[in-house]
Design a protein with these regions (language model features):
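Mid-domain Rossmann-like dinucleotide-binding core that forms the NAD(H)/NADP(H) cofactor-binding site
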Residues: 151-222
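Glycine-rich phosphate-binding loop and adjacent beta-alpha segment
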Residues: 204, 242-308, 340-342
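Glycine-rich beta-strand-centered segment in the early N-terminal region that forms part
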Residues: 40-57, 71-122
Length: 342
């Protein structure tokens, strides 16, 4: 159970004493560091909107930022950005969906009452009743066909999947394999690769295979029973979402001019990837999704056209977010874990 503290920390309370509920963490560590507190309700600046959040998510990325259990090469840069000893930004959360409650005086794209969904990126702040975002941020009107919970599950997974598949130049008729296909990024990658016309092989654990078939995977592989790098198949694109595939064997499983996409690379994979890309016809591509509103709008169009959907495994109320983090830490979630904010 998330701990509750009804006192705002010093300096948090705004004139007038307007407070909101938020999940706060003041140290890195296990899910129990997450505490339900009352903090100052933010006020939008001239070019910002104030969003009343109805739903957010718990992703593997949120858990990594909470615990700092990251690849070695990322730990120091992330600590420098987030806070060396303790987090500077004490409210996690990147995905959100909700309603605009107020707008700054220079805002033109949105108005009060608009139902929106968006991504805060490393600004974080979505584990709360309210947050402010720039009107030029990754924010758009919510798909008309989706609930707040379904819409909140789109941004991080959808934007990352779209980023990598575009960088991998996925084309109609190509063979694409997605390792770790059952998570938030992977489920969107399967659907987007199918939309782009690819023949998709989805790799994950036994309990996720039926779900992966249901969202369009042409072939599924249970990694607990079969190593895809040893079945003799070759692929135009291999997208490793989770960083668990063998670098050497994956590269060997690529066709001539194939692309190996790494969403969560180890340092050794990055070094070897540069060498492989320079010395062979095969390309190794790493990186993170850029924050582009037009990409979110593209995903919205596909959603409203019925081409892609969010996959939701479980839902929790904000007060039980520590329990949600414990579940995501197991690595067994199917698609997304959604948090409702009331």
């Amino acid at each position: 159970m998330t701990q509750t503290d009804s006192k705002a920390t010093q300096g948090d309370q705004l004139p007038g004493g307007i407070l909101m509920k938020a999940i706060v963490y003041t140290q890195y560590g296990p899910p129990d560091v997450l505490q339900l507190k009352e903090v100052a309700k933010p006020t939008p600046k001239d070019k910002e909107v104030l969003i009343r959040i109805d739903a957010t998510t718990v992703t593997a990325a949120d858990c990594e930022l909470r615990s700092l259990k990251l690849p070695i090469w990322l730990r120091l840069p992330i600590r420098i950005y987030l806070g060396l000893i303790r987090p500077r930004n004490k409210i996690l959360g990147q995905d959100l969906a909700g309603e605009i409650e107020a707008v700054g005086k220079e805002v033109t794209r949105f108005k009060k009452g608009d139902q929106v969904f968006g991504w805060t990126g490393f600004r974080l702040g979505a584990y709360a009743e309210y947050t402010c975002l720039s009107e030029d941020g990754v924010l758009a009107i919510k798909p008309a066909t989706m609930t707040y919970e379904e819409a909140a599950a789109v941004p991080l997974g959808g934007l990352n999947a779209l980023h990598f598949l575009r960088n991998g130049n996925v084309q109609s008729g190509q063979k694409v394999l997605i390792q770790g296909a059952g998570g938030s990024i992977g489920t969107f990658a399967v659907q987007l690769a199918k939309y782009f016309g690819a023949e998709v092989t989805a790799v994950d654990s036994t309990g996720k295979l039926d779900m992966l078939r249901s969202i369009g995977a042409d072939h599924v592989i249970d990694y607990t029973q079969e190593d895809f790098t040893k079945n003799g198949e070759t692929y135009d694109v291999i997208f490793d979402v989770v960083g668990k595939s063998s670098f050497t064997r994956s590269v060997r499983s690529l066709k001539h001019n194939g692309r190996y996409l790494l969403a969560n690379p180890r340092l050794s994979q990055m070094v070897r990837g540069r060498w492989t890309s320079r010395r062979s016809s095969k390309q190794v591509i790493v990186g993170a999704a850029s924050e582009k509103t037009e990409d979110l709008l593209f995903l919205k169009e596909l959603i409203e056209a019925g081409k892609i959907q969010s996959v939701i495994d479980r839902g929790y109320p904000l007060e039980h977010i520590a329990e949600a983090h414990r579940y995501v830490d197991t690595g067994h979630k199917k698609g997304n874990v959604v948090i409702t904010v009331e």
